[in-house]
Each structure stands twice: as structure tokens, then as C-alpha cells.
């Protein structure tokens, strides 16, 4: 925090110790007894982060890892658990939920986000549908009470983490055939929709989305500056 300058903004990820229903240990994956523990999140993460970062804290992302069908609760139960958790932690306009299980991109969960003002983090990730499809399933609504719209450009569709890492390494250039033009088109269109609606759009770009995050960001800015009539969302 001592090295942050005025205007610097940080997005933090909530710890998997609280957000993940299962954790990997020496014996493989096991149920996490602290899953959605509101008190643990507040004492061990939220309170220290707010105290340390003050106004530099722009948001907290609750990244829900992908769950296979056999490991997944019904969407209604998941929505109820999420609502219970978000109601028990300190009220804050900087929360965003990233859902990596397509089955949870559904009305019961979106209704919770709408009621509580928690943002939907739109993520371009291995097993998720397109950014435009995620946005459409939410009724093309922006939920975050603080007016922040968050997009994460992480991996190409259908490509696992380790494969995208290996293909992008050493992260010093754009890799031929890796960067999705559709991803750029849809991200730019959603950014424009957000700005036009009076929101602030934040995009987090990973090297694994195409080889080099700064160059991907440059491509996205160029696409954003094009004629809105060419938008795809």
C-alpha cells in the first residue's frame, strides 16, 4: 500500500479457502468446511484488506471454480447459499461474483445478484459460453451497486489452463491463432454498453488469453474505439 499512487485501483480475489467448496490437499480434493464462511472472510480477508488499501480497493472478486455435475448443488440451493453469505458479510458496493459453472448462469443466481447489488464478473474462460451469451443470460443487466462492470479475459474457449500457459509462454508476443477476435468484439461491445449506461468498465487481461496481456489490451482499446455500429452485442 505504501507504493500505491493517487488514483491506483486494485481488484482483489477473495481467498479460495472461503470461496471454493472443495480444496486440493495431499489426498486429493476434499470438502471445504469453511466454504462461504462469512465470519472467516470478514476477519481474515475483508477487514485487513480495507484497512490496508483504503480507497485503492476497487473491487473484490469471488471466483467460483467450475463444478462437474456430480459435485454441483441444484441452482436454487446454490443461490440460497450465496444470498446467505453475501447478507452476512459487510455491506459493500465492490463485490463481484465470477461463476465458472454454466449451469449456475441462471435466474435464481441472477436474482440474488440483483437484490444485493453484487456484480456479475463476465469471464472469457475455458468452459464458459461466450461473453455475449453470459450477458444475455443475465438479461443484459449490470448488477453491481457501485456501477462497476468487470470483465476477465483469461483463456481461449476449450483450452485448459496448462495448455494455454504453455502456448502463451514466454508471454512476449501475440501467438498466432490464439487470440479470439470474437472475444475482443464482445468485450468492446459490453464495455460500450456499460459506459453508455453510466457505469465504469474494468477489464482484467491475462497473458493466457492470447500470448501477451499488454498487446491484447491494446487490441481491445483499438476495437473499443471503432464505430459502435459494428458492435456485436
Language-model regions, residue ranges each:
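Residues lining hydrophobic/aromatic ligand-binding pockets adjacent to catalytic sites
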Residues: 1-233
Amino acid at each position: 500500500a505504501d507504493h500505491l499512487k493517487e488514483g491506483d485501483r486494485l481488484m482483489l480475489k477473495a481467498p479460495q479457502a472461503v470461496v471454493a467448496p472443495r480444496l486440493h490437499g495431499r489426498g486429493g480434493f476434499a470438502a471445504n468446511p469453511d466454504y462461504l464462511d462469512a465470519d472467516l472472510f470478514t476477519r481474515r480477508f475483508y477487514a485487513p484488506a480495507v484497512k490496508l488499501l483504503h480507497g485503492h480497493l476497487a473491487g473484490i472478486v469471488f471466483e467460483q471454480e467450475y463444478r462437474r455435475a456430480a459435485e454441483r448443488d441444484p441452482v436454487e440451493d446454490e443461490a440460497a447459499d450465496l444470498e446467505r453469505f453475501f447478507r452476512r458479510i459487510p455491506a459493500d458496493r465492490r463485490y463481484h461474483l465470477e461463476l465458472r459453472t454454466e449451469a449456475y448462469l441462471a435466474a435464481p443466481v441472477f436474482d440474488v445478484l440483483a437484490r444485493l447489488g453484487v456484480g456479475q464478473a463476465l469471464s472469457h474462460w475455458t468452459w464458459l459460453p461466450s461473453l455475449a451469451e453470459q450477458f444475455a443470460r443475465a438479461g443484459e443487466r449490470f448488477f453491481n451497486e457501485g456501477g462497476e462492470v468487470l470483465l476477465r479475459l483469461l483463456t481461449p474457449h476449450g483450452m485448459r489452463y496448462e495448455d494455454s500457459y504453455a502456448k502463451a509462454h514466454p508471454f512476449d508476443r501475440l501467438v498466432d491463432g490464439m487470440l479470439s477476435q470474437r472475444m475482443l468484439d464482445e468485450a468492446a461491445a459490453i464495455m460500450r454498453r456499460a459506459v453508455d449506461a453510466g457505469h465504469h468498465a474494468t477489464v482484467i487481461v491475462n497473458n493466457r488469453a492470447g500470448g501477451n496481456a499488454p498487446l491484447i489490451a491494446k487490441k481491445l482499446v483499438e476495437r473499443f474505439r471503432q464505430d459502435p455500429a459494428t458492435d456485436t452485442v
